[in-house]
Swiss-Prot record:
Record-listed E.C. numbers: 2.1.1.170
Class of enzymatic activity (EC top level): transferase
Protein task: Specifically methylates the N7 position of guanine in position 527 of 16S rRNA.
Pfam families: GidB
Transmembrane segments annotated in the record for this chain: none
Name the UniProt record assigns to this protein: Ribosomal RNA small subunit methyltransferase G
Binding site for S-adenosyl-L-methionine: G73, L78, V124, E125, R139
Signal sequence interval, chain numbering: none
An example molecular function term from Gene Ontology annotations: rRNA (guanine-N7-)-methyltransferase activity
SUPFAM superfamilies membership: S-adenosyl-L-methionine-dependent methyltransferases
Gene transcribed to yield this protein: rsmG
Length: 207
């Protein structure tokens, strides 16, 4: 699996140190093992996980600004854990409302010795942002409107919302509530992944 990951990274033009590659593979191993009992992802093939979960997450990293992030509705740690592995100088709070997912995240934290993640079991509306975050990240979590309505209290003054989407979500963008604007839409390239991927970066219009 390490060779497959290395080829995918080469195809994407991404260079990672060997220990980070080993951590990413170990995470996929754990996800595959726990998935049999906990049903954490619909993806069953570890090599497919490398494409649809690992590469699909880490291609976002160059576009993140800041060092304190929260991954809302993280599920089994996506995109938060792959991002934490490749961005060790940043901290990621991984938020999910389901206990089985958070238990898995804590086991990943323990086995991979990730000291830059904090798994939390909470609903996003009830989670305090003290201090506020530089970025609020979501992947397959909610519509853009729901994301900013539920998470509006989380980013700091210069903080941003980072929504990982498939096709460009023009309908969701046009339905954004007043007070929020699109700062950038990035078309992402993920090797061996069918379909489009976009990163929508939003910012609150603070007066």
């Amino acid at each position: 699996m390490l060779n497959t990951l290395t080829r995918l990274l080469d195809d994407a033009g991404i260079t990672l140190p060997e220990h980070q590659k080993a951590q990413l593979v170990a995470y996929v191993d754990m996800l595959n093992k726990w998935n049999k009992a906990y049903n954490l992802t619909s993806v069953r093939d570890p090599n497919e996980m490398l494409v649809r979960h690992i590469m699909d997450s880490i291609v976002v990293e160059p576009h993140l600004k800041g060092t304190r992030f929260i991954d809302v509705g993280t599920g089994p740690g996506l995109p938060g854990i792959p991002l934490a592995i490749v961005r060790p100088d940043s901290h990621f709070t991984l938020l999910d409302s389901l206990g089985k997912r958070v238990r898995f995240l804590r086991q990943v934290q323990h086995e991979l010795k990730l000291d830059n993640i904090t798994p939390v079991q909470s609903r996003v509306e009830a989670f305090p942002a003290e201090p506020p975050f530089d970025g609020v990240i979501s992947r397959a979590f909610a519509s853009l409107s729901d994301m900013v309505n539920w998470c509006h209290h989380l980013p700091g003054e210069e903080g941003r919302f980072y929504a990982l989407k498939g096709q460009r979500p023009d309908d969701e963008i046009s339905a954004l509530p007043s007070g929020f604007a699109v700062e950038e839409i990035v078309r992402l390239s993920v090797p061996r992944l069918d379909g489009e991927r976009h990163l929508v970066i939003l910012k609150a219009n603070r007066t």
